[in-house]
Amino acid sequence: MPCVQAQYGSSPQGASPASQSYTYHSSGEYSSDFLTPEFVKFSMDLTNTEITATTSLPSFSTFMDNYNTSYDVKPPCLYQMPLSGQQSSVKVEDIQMHGYQQHGHLPPQSEEMMSHSGSVYYKPSSPPTSSTPGFPVQHSPMWDNHGSLHSFNQNYVATRGGHVPRLSLFSFKQSPPGTPVSSCQMRFDGHHVSMNPETSGAHHVIDGQTFAVPNPIRKQASMGFPGLQLGHASQLIDSQVPSPPSRGSPSNEGLCAVCGDNAACQHYGVRTCEGCKGFFKRTVQKNAKYVCLANKNCPVDKRRRNRCQYCRFQKCLVVGMVKEVVRTDSLKGRRGRLPSKPKSPQEPSPPSPPVSLISALVRAHVDSNPAVSSLDYSRFQANPEYQMNGDDTQHIQQFYDLLTGSMEIIRGWAEKIPGFSELHKQDQDLLFESAFLELFVLRLAYRSNPAEGKLIFCNGVVLNRLQCVRGFGEWIDSIVDFSSNLHSMNIDISAFSCIAALAVITERHGLKEPKRVEELQNKIVNCLKDHVTFNNGGLNRPNYLSKLLGKLPELRTLCTQGLQRIFYLKLEDLVPPPAIIDKLFLDTLPF
């Protein structure tokens, strides 16, 4: 049986079979030429095109930088190098070439040529040595597979017309470190043939030529030459490697308006962090008073927010946090509902904790005003037509009814002012009777809408300004003008509640305990000053507090006009005034 042998000449030192070029001739002889170390190529007589596979061996790149030549890539047919350093040869015999067929028939000459089994002797290169001392040389598992060449020859099938052409070159190139391991590809005349192990037994048709790449080749290619071309590898890396997540703050989160820390939602009307929310809540519930040790302009940020409690609380008010929204201890967990009545009146209730003064004033004002849904429009006329010679009795009686109906409501409001019920009983009556007409005008002007000509009274009755002319006389025109001026100042409910309280808590002639009244008045003034000074509107209007307090003398003038109207109606004697109005008139006359 003929034997095909490969004869080699002298090999340069350190050469290996991978650095030799094998060429098959028609005579059945093999010749080998050593290539230069710069271009190490393994030539096989398969086609005239080139099969390129990049190897991805990241561990080699670290230790091969000192070499001037490329390292040798061992094909799957080589056995593992002996570590003893001795030069030896290995003989591979009985290599059978199968599978060359055309339309299921094997040509005689091809069958005879490929049925020959020969002996090929390989001369291994010297064992590799590590350039780094102490680093062990690791061997790939493919060197231990001694039957890889045999399996390659038995499973490789190439269907092509004619004789086997010259072997093309297999180029083995070093891939950069980090290239992902993948199956190699074969290039035939500009086409790619994949050696992916997932497509077992796949056939590739190229210009009418079928190439079947079996599992052993794909396995060896995946083990020995794991890498795509650089273009495919870069695409694979871009598609598989996720980008690192950004470390920025979440988009659904903002910054605290007080200290600049992260704030997820709004608290008491302003987006603030949990720390500033709790600080503001505790301060309001305990009615705490702070003192600044500096010039009341301490910086308040995330790092220094705990240094000065006074400046921190003032900044909370400046950015717009509303103290009235904070629930007191008696309303905790009740969602703003009023506390229920005690089950048994005999049980003494525990003393209530200190409540914010301005919060109590706002609550008293809201409770004493009619709700929008309960307004009475039954007597409202948008364009009333009055005859000057009509009966005035009905309009005068309506005037008295509106005054008496408002009196009980305003008295109930005054009793809810913190500290008012603790005053002397005679002082309470004197303060209320002296300020009733002032409070009647002030509350009516704040509730009404002068632009539309609507007047909303304490009992919920809505009337047109023209409907009140016959009963109120010229006094109603002064009230409407005062209402327009009051609305132009854009007074919020907190400031108005303080102004209304100051209208009744003031110095009057004949007080039994004027000192206690003065102390209560100072508390309300300071509360109004703090609210106006550190409110957003107050900072832009430096004289805003003076304008608010200037409304109190105007109320005194309007009160005098009201007394004059009552006095005129008494003289007219068309309708006798109610006893309570008559007593009020006699007790409050300044002359």
From Swiss-Prot:
GO terms for cellular component: cytoplasm; nucleus. It comes from Xenopus tropicalis (Western clawed frog). This is Nuclear receptor subfamily 4 group A member 2. A motif (Nuclear localization signal (NLS1)) lies at residues 331-343. Belongs to the nuclear hormone receptor family. Residues 345-354 have a biased composition (Pro residues). Transcriptional regulator which may play a role in the differentiation and maintenance of meso-diencephalic dopaminergic (mdDA) neurons. A motif (nuclear export sequence (NES1)) lies at residues 436-445. GO terms for molecular function: nuclear receptor activity; sequence-specific DNA binding; zinc ion binding. The gene is nr4a2. Residues 1-22, 110-133, 330-354 are annotated as: Disordered.
